Amino acid sequence: MIRTMFKSKIHRATVTHADLHYVGSVTVDLDLLDAADILPGELVSIVDVTNGARLETYTIAGERGSGVIGINGAAAHLVHVDDTVILITYAEMTTEEARTYEPRVVHVGKDNKILQLGNDPAEGHTPGLMRPPHALSNAAHLS
C-alpha cells in the first residue's frame, strides 16, 4: 500500500511580501528550502496561522539568507504580509518506509532565521506553544 505521509515543514514563518500580480507560487529563502528538504517547484500546502486560510502552490527558490517568504499571485488574496504561516510537504511511501521515515521540521524565529531543526511534527519550539494533548513523540511511537 502507498500512503501519503507528512514529509517536512517550515514552522511559523512570517510572510515578508504578498503580490497579487506575480506568477502564482511561494518564494522561499533557499536556506529554508534546503533545511526542510523542499525542492524548487515542489508542491506545498500553506496554512495561515493568522487567519486560518489553507492553500496549495509550488515553491520558487528565493535568495539565500534573505528570510523571504513571498506569496505570489492569487494566493495573495488569502495570505498577507506579516501573517504567520506553516509550509508543509507530503510524500508517497510504502507502509514500511512510512514506519521508519523521519520528517524534517524547521522552526524559524524572527526574520525567518532557523532556530532549530527536528523531526517531530508535534514538537513546539516557540514560546507558548505546547505539544497537543496525548500526542506521542516520534521516538515513542516508533519504538
Swiss-Prot record:
It comes from Paenarthrobacter aurescens (strain TC1). It catalyses: L-aspartate + H(+) = beta-alanine + CO2. Substrate binds at T57, G73, A74, A75. InterPro entries: Asp_de-COase-like_dom_sf (IPR009010), Asp_decarbox (IPR003190). GO terms for molecular function: aspartate 1-decarboxylase activity. The active site is at S25 (schiff-base intermediate with substrate), Y58 (proton donor). Pfam families: Asp_decarbox. This is Aspartate 1-decarboxylase 2. The keyword Metal-binding does not apply.
